[in-house]
Amino acid sequence: MNSCASINDEVITKYNELILGHISKGIIIKFSDDFKEVVFEDSFNGESFEDYINKFPQDDCRYGVYDFSYMDNKENKKNKIFFISWCPVETKIKNKIVHTATEQSIYKKLVGIDAIIKATDNTEISQSLVEERCK
């Protein structure tokens, strides 16, 4: 049994729009209902990273990509593209297996990612933790 899902072309299109066109600050990616494909779920244009993270369900896996803006130690505005692997403890085992098996495949398709964040709950991902990763 192959537990790795294929990646829908719309995911790549939305990712390219994010990093090249700056159309949104973030995207959320999920599995299709049959777990055979990774599909685009939503774009995010809100104010804060915390608002973005709050869009992730507490009981199901998601992937995300976020264009994080920050100031470096010389007060220059910088951006880092974060790939987020969200796999809450409450997620069904089958979902976790497919999520884990597919993670590297999707990460490799999204060229230009600066950093990866793996989280199972909100204590493992916050604006302050992401800012720390930017240093």
From Swiss-Prot:
The keyword Cytoplasm applies. Coiled coil: none annotated. Pfam families: Cofilin_ADF (PF00241). One of its GO terms (molecular function) is actin filament binding. It is found in: Cytoplasm, Cytoskeleton. SMART domains: ADF (SM00102). Belongs to the actin-binding proteins ADF family. PANTHER family: COFILIN-RELATED (PTHR11913). This is Cofilin-4. The lineage of its organism: Eukaryota, Amoebozoa, Evosea, Eumycetozoa, Dictyostelia.
